[in-house]
Design a protein with these regions (language model features):
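Canonical AAA+ ATPase core
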Residues: 1-56, 109-111
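C-terminal engagement/docking regions of AAA+ P-loop ATPases
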Residues: 113-169
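Context-gated lysine
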Residues: 13, 23, 46, 86-90, ...
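Conserved AAA+ ATPase small/helical "lid" subdomain
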Residues: 41, 48-124
């Protein structure tokens, strides 16, 4: 026998639903998005650290502020509003899942380790971040640019991320 583990998300329904025969043969588990930002940050930082060790990346563990920023961006875009609730946002067509946040940071860590100074910087995160948000080159690009100009640009401690993301465009 063998085990098969696969993942999907609720927003990617595809053309056809899973057939009744397959539903009987597979155990499906639906995991909700983490309830709090702190819970999501904890999951992301733990998984990124595990992956970095497994890949034996010669980079330092990501600074918590980079993890926090990526998670905050994902949560704000996913929820359609800023953390403080003052600004309504358009949401991209992608899922903006916790798994994608982990992927963005893992990619940034690999870039920092092999092409940078071994420390995760905004420039290492920017390319993967833009790629995670912009799935549809028309609709999502507008959502991303609006978020970049109205939210990221206005946060004084995010100037480096704003510049790095603008350079990717």
């Amino acid at each position: 026998g063998f085990n098969l583990i696969a993942t999907a998300n609720n927003r990617d329904k595809g053309v056809n639903e899973l057939s009744s025969a397959l539903k009987r043969r597979f155990n499906t588990v639906i995991l909700p998005v983490p309830a709090t930002e702190e819970e999501e940050i904890s999951i992301v930082s733990k998984r990124v650290s595990e992956m970095d060790r497994a890949l034996e990346l010669p980079a330092e563990p990501p600074a918590m502020h980079e993890v926090r920023r990526v998670v905050q961006i994902f949560r704000e875009l996913r929820n359609g509003q800023t953390e403080d609730g003052k600004t309504k946002l358009k949401s991209p067509t992608g899922t903006m899942s916790t798994a994608e946040a982990i992927s963005v940071l893992n990619s940034g860590m690999a870039l920092a380790a092999h092409f940078g100074d071994g420390v995760l910087h905004a420039r290492d995160v920017a390319a993967s971040l833009v790629g995670a948000v912009v799935k549809d080159p028309v609709q999502d690009d507008l959502v991303w640019r609006e978020y970049l100009e109205t939210v990221v640009k206005e946060r004084s401690d995010w100037k480096d991320l704003y510049r790095a993301c603008r350079e990717v465009d």
